[in-house]
Swiss-Prot record:
Keyword match Cytoplasm: yes
Family to which the UniProt record says this protein belongs: Belongs to the DNA polymerase type-C family. DnaE2 subfamily.
Entry GO CC: cytoplasm
Designated gene of the protein: dnaE2
Cited Gene3D superfamilies: Metal-dependent hydrolases (3.20.20.140), Nucleic acid-binding proteins (2.40.50.140)
Protein name, UniProt field: Error-prone DNA polymerase
Length: 1083
């Protein structure tokens, strides 16, 4: 007897949000393991999950069918829709686009009429409701008649008492309507073990606890994939229902591999092809990039790249990116390409990238390779405040029917998973909050039992253990779709005939359902239009330098003076607060050890403080060899296998240590004799080592390949271990070089013009590692005067102002480096109104500037000028009226006394002759502590004093020393330091170590918290805002840390800042909480 065959045609992934309880990949691989012919992915009104299932099955025996469950708004039963060819698939995606664009984000509104308009080439399985009433019979007859031989009736076993009667009824309805029954198991998860999770997400969807869910949950755990034998047994009275599943599969000719969209044609000059136009643009750019002539080496590189671009039919793509960059620059928007595109001389000549790949010997095959056959991927960073202008240009140029932003998947993270699971299981809010509070950062490190115990929870308690297990299952599930940060997909045919397009939350934005990984799997080309805060800061800095300092020669990144020794002096001193990419504690610790003296050193600096080199044990060998503390050893292949210097060619500039992905690929090709295709497979496998372990095929081939060519086995194994490190995020050299450019530019601005640097960084917030309070402090330590927000002189942004009369620049701290030649020309930084919490740029500032221009000085005059009362209160509380002789309390009193909010009040005749506004009264002065507390509450910083200075005597009594004392303490000395917690950082490569930065009135102290100490004091380390760290001094390479042993949380003490004599009248609104300044936490 022939074994049964079966295809599951009703499988729901977790992209049917809060319904499916398995990943698409799990469904596909389980279907293969159980021997199914095919599996059809039919998410609700969505194609978001199908590419993942298709990708997982690409090289396997299981076939994944692309389908969709269409739910209708007009009462028609749902339909499992399967397109039979490419054109039918285009109709389905257009249908879904129509439904999504007419609805709110995340919804899709369709009618049966909509479907009929797009039904050509579609097969449909009609999904019966639970109750088979007369209206369903009418719908069934109509739908089957409309589809004329292309419809079936989906029949599933509900495992209920009346199952067989229901199936018999469906079989009868199918026979009379012309839509015969077909067996499905209406799959919601790949295996029965996922049933509890499906119950939980059903409760989340239905907004109820599991105790009250009742019939809203599935009755059993049978909605999983079943084998052909099991389905044949379940439908033994209706064997044709099982056989029809395979017959339907045979009628479906469409496969996702059929999607190979052409890139849109670009307009070119008359008589020119796209390739000829690209060639002209490239050589024109080469003349601009190389004003002294294009060398033979560069010429050969450009010619080879153009040959490959033509062969692979990519010229239109390069013209597109060139056009976008050209348009951005015409609008005065700073931009720079990065990533693998920096390997291309064509991109460099087109002005897309800023790094000369021939100068740095970068590998073009990392960008484009005919062996890989993958489309190029160009990432371009734009100023983050102006990127939207560039994106709207792309929409306008190509049309929304041909351009859209990639989707991105918002996943469940530990905290959100815990909260949803806790609600579903009926846990109290207190218990759920305690569970969520054990998670560090957004992804955390799971829910270890010791963390639960530290939070006062018993990990063995059944309800806790169950919640933790289900939360761990839910982590990584998709919650909803959103738009990618800037990946554009452009197509020659209508994009909505390739993928559904939906509404984004942002006005005038649309995005597709597939994310960048889906796009890569399908081979579609995209352009990444990304935002980078540092570019915005640099552009603002260059504008200030031209307008305030007369540096008219400075117009572009290329104009920045190159290789200035003072810039490297500053970086070697780890004086890098605010400098792009090298401002973290790890980078600051590395700078004095690496001691950069030229641009390529910055490339190394960017790349070396990454998880890849750290995990691959590359950092210490590189530093020792660079600093001549150990010799560089160059193992050689046997003479018959290659030149003795083959490793030196690959690793010479990094002292024999592979720091970059390109070097790993070259090592595989030259030393282990991988083909370029195999080396690219190794590059891709780097991304999977962390999750799947090292594939033996690559390990063995690499090691045996090197050993077979005469290298020692131990050396070959060490090389592969270093390559494995790249699975933990290592930089390509091209990417590091692009970022190093911005490291140098931002460092030069900080060194030469720290006044401009401070103002530009604050104006570009939010960005970077530090908050305005630390940027201001750093500027003042470099000798820059910083002035508070002022009602008469501030703008929204920070501006440069004349130095105050009597200002005496402080001596620059010994650990701070600045240009002495420009120092006499530095100006003061006037903080802008942006620093005052609650003020609105578009509503509050225009009337304020207008009133000020008309002579307003007092609160009453600004009120008469139309400044809202709320804005005047915020300005008064921020002490912005000091320049007109009003203290904080006096200004607030005056504002509170105004009789009208936006204009002077109309005076009643009875009150004629009385003053319109309250007269000035004598109010008690605020204590210094209160002034500082109010500064922090209103502007997040204070120029008057540092809060910790008020606690110095108390701290001294506890044996706590100021941060500046660390400079004079010996290695190993016991010490206690205290301060506001600025930054908590827990890198994934640090094996549980946490780095904490404290700030007091004398400087900053950096504490290292080893894992055991962190686990013992987890809550204090994670939450304290004012902290004493007790430990020992660690000094190495001019870097000082405190290795923490224990902690004292003083956060509650901060509330005493306002507890001074002289209560405000009227009382300033808010209390100062125990958190003056919110830390920035990184993980």
């Amino acid at each position: 007897m022939r074994p049964p065959v079966y295809a599951e045609l009703q499988a729901t992934t977790n992209f049917s949000f809060l319904r499916g309880a398995s990943h698409a990949e799990e469904l596909a691989l389980t279907a293969e393991a159980l021997g199914l012919t095919a599996i059809g992915i039919v998410d609700r009104n969505s194609l978001a999950g199908v590419v993942r299932a298709w990708t997982a099955a690409k090289r396997r025996s299981i076939r994944v069918l692309t389908g969709c469950r269409l739910d209708f708004m007009d009462g028609a039963p749902s339909l499992l829709c399967y397109p039979t060819d490419r054109e039918a698939f285009g109709r389905l995606t257009r249908l879904l686009t129509i439904g999504q664009l007419r609805a709110e984000k995340g919804e899709c509104h369709l009618t049966w009429r909509d479907f009929l308009d797009h039904s050509e080439g579609q097969l449909g399985l009609i999904v019966p409701p639970r109750v088979l009433d007369d209206s369903f019979e009418q719908h069934l007859t109509r739908m089957a008649g409309d589809l004329r031989g292309r419809s079936w009736l989906a029949a599933s076993r509900a495992y209920a008492a009346r199952d067989l009667q229901r199936l018999a009824r469906l079989e009868s309805l199918g026979r009379t309507s012309g839509a015969p029954i077909v067996a499905t198991n209406d799959v919601l998860y790949h295996g029965p073990e996922r049933r509890p999770l499906q119950d939980v997400i059903s409760c989340v969807r239905e907004h109820c606890a599991i105790q009250e869910a009742g019939f809203r949950l599935e009755a059993n755990a049978e909605r999983h994939i079943k084998s052909p034998e099991e389905m044949a047994r379940l439908f033994d009275r209706w064997p044709r229902a099982v056989e029809r599943t395979v017959e339907i599969v045979e009628r479906i000719g469409f496969d996702l591999k059929d999607i190979r969209e052409q890139y849109p044609d670009e307009p070119v000059p008359p008589g020119k092809t796209a390739m000829q136009h690209l060639t002209d643009l490239t050589w024109k750019g080469a003349a601009w990039r190389y004003p002294n002539g294009v060398s033979p080496k560069v010429t050969a590189q450009i010619q080879e790249e153009l040959r490959l671009i033509e062969k692979m039919d990519y010229p239109n793509y390069f013209i597109t990116v060139h056009d976008i960059v050209r348009e951005a620059r015409s609008m005065g928007i700073l931009c720079q390409g990065r990533g693998s595109a920096a390997n291309s001389s064509v991109c460099f000549c087109l002005g897309v990238t800023a790094i000369d790949p021939t100068e740095h010997r970068l590998l073009f095959t990392r960008f484009i390779s005919e062996n890989r056959g993958e489309p190029p991927d160009i990432d371009v960073d734009f100023e983050h405040d102006r990127r939207e202008e560039v994106m709207q240009y792309v929409f306008q140029r190509y049309g929304r029917a041909y351009a859209a932003i990639c989707g991105t998947v918002i996943h469940y993270r530990p905290r959100s998973a815990i909260r949803d699971v806790g609600k579903a299981l009926g846990l109290t809010e207190d218990v759920t909050s305690l569970l969520a509070g054990t998670v560090w950062g957004s992804w955390g490190d799971g829910l270890p039992e010791d963390h639960l115990r530290n939070a006062g929870l018993d990990p063995k308690a059944p309800e806790i253990a169950r919640a933790v297990g289900l939360a761990n299952d839910l982590i990584g599930f998709p919650r909803h779709l959103s738009q990618h940060v800037g990946g554009f997909v452009l197509t020659k045919r209508r994009l909505d005939e390739t993928v559904p397009i939906g509404k984004a939350a942002m006005k005038d934005r649309t995005f597709i359902e597939w994310d960048k990984d889906d796009i890569d799997s399908l081979g579609l080309m995209k352009v990444d239009i990304l935002a980078l805060g540092m570019l915005h800061a640099i552009q603002r800095a260059m504008t200030m330098l031209r307008e305030d300092h007369g540096q008219d020669w400075l117009k572009d990144l290329a104009d920045i003076p190159k290789e200035v020794p003072g810039v490297y002096d500053m970086l070697c001193a780890a004086d890098s607060v605010g400098v792009f990419q090298v401002e973290s504690r790890a980078q600051m610790s590395m700078l004095p050890r690496l001691r950069p003296r030229e641009f390529y050193d910055l490339v190394i600096q960017v790349a070396i403080v990454r998880p890849g080199p750290i995990q691959g044990d590359m950092v210490h060998p590189y530093l020792k060899r660079r600093n001549k503390e150990e010799p560089v050893d160059w193992p050689k292949p046997s003479p018959e296998h290659g030149p003795p210097d083959e490793l030196q060619e690959i690793l010479g500039k990094t002292f024999g240590v592979p720091l970059f992905q390109e070097q790993a690929m070259s090592l595989a090709i030259e030393a282990a004799k991988f083909t370029p295709d195999e080396a690219d497979g190794l590059r891709k496998a780097m991304a999977t080592f962390r999750n799947l372990g090292s594939p033996d095929a690559y390990r063995n081939k690499f090691i045996e390949g090197m050993v077979g060519r005469g290298y020692e086995r131990a050396f070959a194994e060490r090389c592969f271990k270093q390559i494995e490190g790249f699975s933990h995020y290592g930089f390509p050299e091209s990417h590091a070089a692009s970022f190093a450019k911005l490291v140098y530019v931002s460092a030069w601005i900080k060194w030469a013009w720290p006044d401009v640097f401070c103002a530009a960084l604050i104006n570009a917030q939010p960005m970077g590692f530090y908050q305005p309070a630390q940027l201001v402090r750093d500027a003042r330590e470099h000798g820059v005067e910083v002035l508070p927000p002022d009602i008469l002189t501030s703008d929204w942004d920070c501006t440069l102002a004349p130095i105050s009369t009597g200002f005496r620049p402080p001596r620059v701290r010994h650990d701070k480096v600045a240009c002495q030649e420009t120092r006499p020309r530095w100006k003061a930084v006037r903080l802008g109104f942006r620093q005052i919490k609650g003020l609105r740029e578009t509503l509050d500032i225009p009337p304020l500037l207008k009133a000020r221009g008309e002579g307003a000085r007092t609160p009453a005059e600004f009120a008469q000028g139309g400044v809202p009362q709320k804005a005047l209160e915020l300005l008064a509380e921020a002490d912005a009226f000091a320049s007109v002789g009003l203290s904080r309390r006096e200004a607030l009193w005056a504002v509170k006394g105004l009789k009208g909010e936006h204009k002077a009040p109309v005076q009643a005749p009875l009150l004629a002759g009385l003053p319109l506004f309250e007269e000035r009264v004598a109010l008690p002065a605020m204590a210094a502590t209160q002034e500082v507390a109010e500064d922090y509450r209103t502007t997040s910083l204070s120029l008057k004093a540092h809060p910790i200075g008020f606690y110095r005597s108390m701290l001294a009594a506890r044996g706590v020393v100021p941060a500046e004392r660390l400079l004079s303490l010996k290695d190993g000395a016991r010490v206690s330091v205290a301060g506001l917690v600025l930054i908590r950082q827990r890198p994934g490569t640090a094996k549980g170590v946490v780095f904490v930065t404290l700030e007091d009135e004398t400087g900053v102290a950096n504490a290292v918290v080893w894992k055991d100490r962190f686990d013992a004091a987890r809550n204090v380390v994670m939450t304290a805002s004012f902290l004493i760290v007790h430990g020992r001094v660690q000094r190495a390479d001019n870097v000082i840390h405190v290795v923490a042993e224990r902690f004292t949380d003083l956060s509650a003490e901060l509330s005493s800042l306002r507890d001074e004599p002289g209560a405000p009248a009227p009382r300033i609104r808010q209390k100062v909480s125990g958190r003056l300044l919110r830390s920035r936490d990184f993980h």
